[in-house]
Amino acid sequence: MESMFSSPAEAALQRETGVPGLLTPLPDLDGVYELERVAGFVRDLGCERVALQFPDQLLGDAVAVAARLEETTGSKMFILGDTAYGSCCVDVLGAEQAGAQALIHFGPACLSPPARPLPVAFVLRQRSVALELCVKAFEAQNPDPKAPVVLLSEPACAHALEALATLLRPRYLDLLVSSPAFPQPVGSLSPEPMPLERFGRRFPLAPGRRLEEYGAFYVGGSKASPDPDLDPDLSRLLLGWAPGQPFSSCCPDTGKTQDEGARAGRLRARRRYLVERARDARVVGLLAGTLGVAQHREALAHLRNLTQAAGKRSYVLALGRPTPAKLANFPEVDVFVLLACPLGALAPQLSGSFFQPILAPCELEAACNPAWPPPGLAPHLTHYADLLPGSPFHVALPPPESELWETPDVSLITGDLRPPPAWKSSNDHGSLALTPRPQLELAESSPAASFLSSRSWQGLEPRLGQTPVTEAVSGRRGIAIAYEDEGSG
């Protein structure tokens, strides 16, 4: 138990310091990191200062990449590492502190739009794909040539999807290829209608077609994620895909396939459990998990309104990356809600090492908004932007007089009947309103006070005026190992 809250003392003596060695051979550096394309991006913008953001696992190549780019572009490069939140998000705050005019993001990315206008280029590090093995795996999982199927992949394998589709199209008639949804530059206008954008990908659907009609074939996993259950990108797709459609995955190295239906069922069951925990909760901790993704302020205000409407008390916590040791300092909080990008919001849920559940914003929406989800939509969204006004999935809170608030609700965890939420005015910053009683007493309902009264130890209690006054008497003599009145037995 001690190791969950602190590192052992000998870890400091055994820790190896210094910069990790070069991960990629120098001759392969240009191809792996697409340095020619990146250099062209920098020269076209005419930037003098550029930030290079690397995740922890790629920092070994950062110095060599920065030196090569400075040599080819003449611009000053700044390396960003150890981001305060998830490394998959663009660190616009770190780039601004360095005075950078553009940012290059290397490694896995959630492709969430940044909160502030900044030219950004993404380098996903292309991963080799065994196309012939993937074709055989696809044919084994999809024997019907007329069945509609979408080709999906992890970001590092997206470059091979068109080549895979070219090999499959002579036999399969209804094949759709997804592509990464890179954020559009601020103020840019597209001459053509944008395709459907969901799960960080774009889907060029034909007119009249819906994504819910398609099954899915996912290329990725294994090498990038040894444990598929801990892969937030695949989990996001499994949660959001239509429950009645087939979903299979394929390893790009070996062609090994797996039907993901059972895993999707487990993820949805876990999400339903988390929604029930949120409905039972009285105190909710809102964790600020990002400061660099667009609309994070609006989403935080939306979540606070949700908890207030549902009669729950909420606290906003800015702790950086959530860890079990940090969140264990708040035992009064029943559930935490992590406001982060889609990948960052799912990662703590999949780890399973926290003392209290960590929810995604859409799970809190399902728990606190009786009008959500809208008809025909399963509550399996993964990005908080889908909950805000302007999104096709946004559903406003019902008015206080709506019958939806009075619908009887029984907890599936405790079996108790949940009381309807008590609406509070916006200027009430304390607990529920004080109510006069016939005996001229005041009754106060406070989740914090209820939690304190249930604790076995409530701190030092002065008990002023409640302790009888007695004369001072002689205490025990000696030391703890042998007091004088204990004898020598």
Curated annotation (Swiss-Prot):
Its cofactor is [4Fe-4S] cluster. Pfam families: Diphthamide_syn (PF01866). Pathway: Protein modification; peptidyl-diphthamide biosynthesis. The modification N-acetylmethionine is found at M1. GO terms for cellular component: 2-(3-amino-3-carboxypropyl)histidine synthase complex; cytosol. The modification Phosphothreonine is found at T435, T467. Binds 1 [4Fe-4S] cluster per subunit. The cluster facilitates the reduction of the catalytic iron-sulfur cluster in the DPH1 subunit. The modification Phosphoserine is found at S7, S446, S456, S488. Strongly expressed in skeletal muscle. Moderately expressed in heart, small intestine, liver, pancreas, testis and colon. Weakly expressed in brain, placenta, kidney, spleen, thymus, prostate, ovary and lymphocytes. Keywords: Acetylation, Disease variant, Dwarfism, Ectodermal dysplasia, Hypotrichosis, Intellectual disability, Iron, Iron-sulfur, Metal-binding, Phosphoprotein. Coiled coil: none annotated. GO terms for molecular function: 2-(3-amino-3-carboxypropyl)histidine synthase activity; 4 iron, 4 sulfur cluster binding; metal ion binding. [4Fe-4S] cluster binds at C89, C110, C341. The keyword Iron-sulfur applies. It comes from the Eukaryota. Component of the 2-(3-amino-3-carboxypropyl)histidine synthase complex composed of DPH1, DPH2, DPH3 and a NADH-dependent reductase. Interacts with DPH1. It is linked to Developmental delay with short stature, dysmorphic facial features, and sparse hair 2: An autosomal recessive syndrome characterized by developmental delay with variably impaired intellectual development and speech delay, short stature, abnormal head circumference, dysmorphic facial features, and sparse scalp hair. Affected individuals may have other abnormalities, including congenital cardiac defects and distal skeletal anomalies. PANTHER family: 2-(3-AMINO-3-CARBOXYPROPYL)HISTIDINE SYNTHASE SUBUNIT 2 (PTHR10762:SF2), DIPHTHAMIDE BIOSYNTHESIS PROTEIN (PTHR10762). Required for the first step of diphthamide biosynthesis, a post-translational modification of histidine which occurs in elongation factor 2. DPH1 and DPH2 transfer a 3-amino-3-carboxypropyl (ACP) group from S-adenosyl-L-methionine (SAM) to a histidine residue, the reaction is assisted by a reduction system comprising DPH3 and a NADH-dependent reductase. Facilitates the reduction of the catalytic iron-sulfur cluster found in the DPH1 subunit. Belongs to the DPH1/DPH2 family. DPH2 subfamily. This is 2-(3-amino-3-carboxypropyl)histidine synthase subunit 2. It comes from Homo sapiens. The gene is DPH2.
